[in-house]
């Protein structure tokens, strides 16, 4: 339950002395001559030692205020919730979340219905590449179910009662992705005390860990586990623009596919090459 979890963490944060400003739009972040950060909002300016960019689908635009070009792409994603089903109501305990590589879907119980979220294997689309309107808040996109047809047919084979179910709700909105599917967690390149916690495509399961280890990094200068694979500095300028879009689409479409030995995903290649690349290519490498 994301809403309850978030509310509980907010209560704990306030008990620890944090101040939370709701319905407050951030307009800019600026580095001051003192080395502190000025966070400019529509209700005044807050001066602070550290800034964390955890702006979700807006993270790339927020990063642009300080000169960052973050390899984050918003992908269109659907999930569907069925009407109540007698088969689900008859269960004496909640079944586990299921990830189905064949259908490229996830399934979980939603009250007495089923929630199904497909990651289409082809035809996936990026969204908001030219920026997202700052007023886009808790809004959804119009359903585009045609490209989900194959996944939903395979889901019906996996869960037969789904094929007879009525659809109660279709949710279609943006979800962030990065070229390698990992989020951006840690210090931003060449900026003092500017931290990133964004680009996650699996939010609620990864969120608590992200908060824990980012806090350790900020306070102690290191984390108790190795988070190298999530370090934003694994990317350079080469990873932005068309490369980020192409790889994020590919990553989305391969979300639930097993990585097999010898797999070669040529999307985005060649981007970074050695001085020997052309010669080796001539020789058939």
Predicted regions: what is each one?
Residues 1-50, 58, 208:
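Helical element adjacent to the flavin cofactor pocket in flavoenzyme catalytic cores
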Residues 8, 102, 111, 125, ...:
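C-terminal catalytic lobe of FAD-dependent flavoproteins
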Residues 14, 64, 281:
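Anion (oxyanion) recognition and catalysis
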Residues 14, 56, 67, 215-219, ...:
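Hydrophobic/aromatic-lined pockets within catalytic cores
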Residues 20-22, 53, 116, 166-168, ...:
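General beta-strand structural signal in soluble alpha/beta enzymes
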Residues 29-142, 150-158, 240-255, 259-266, ...:
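Flavin-dependent oxidoreductases
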Residues 69-72, 99, 221-225, 284:
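A short alpha-helix-loop-beta-strand transition element characteristic
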Residues 268-284:
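Long, low-complexity segments enriched in small/aliphatic residues
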